[in-house]
Amino acid sequence: MRIAYDAKRLFNNFTGLGNYSRTLLDGQLKNYPEDLHLLYTPKVRATEQTQPYIRRNRCRVVRPGALFPGGFWRTFGLAGRAAKDRVDLFHGLSHELPIGLVRRRIPSVVTMHDVAWHTFPQMYHAIDRRIYDLKARYACRYATRIVAISESTKRDV
């Protein structure tokens, strides 16, 4: 199976969302050694935590070309790239999916960790809350499956 991931957090976040991404991928690699894992990310921070995924045999890091800025690529370019890479499944590891997976008939999973921008709106700028909300709503509407990491998140979503 060819599984694609929005791996931005895996390579650039070294707390909750990044740890979740790396732990999930470790489990996939251990339990399904025949699968190929395509790690889509706009940039890679090469650290002790990320080096294993850069060099691992069944992982391939995929970055945008020069024409696509990172955020634009993650939202509007990944579905096309996933189709080109003939992926069997796309996993949005943190609240969002690229636009166009459904049109390309690529099944998807999105992991929802929380909806903190709703729970604690005072901690977020209005524009950020709007963007997070739009991305999360889109992902939950179009995902083949939604993973909520807790019962509380399940209720909130």
What are these regions (language model features)?
Residues 1-157:
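Carbohydrate transferase catalytic cores enriched for Leloir-type hexosyltransferases
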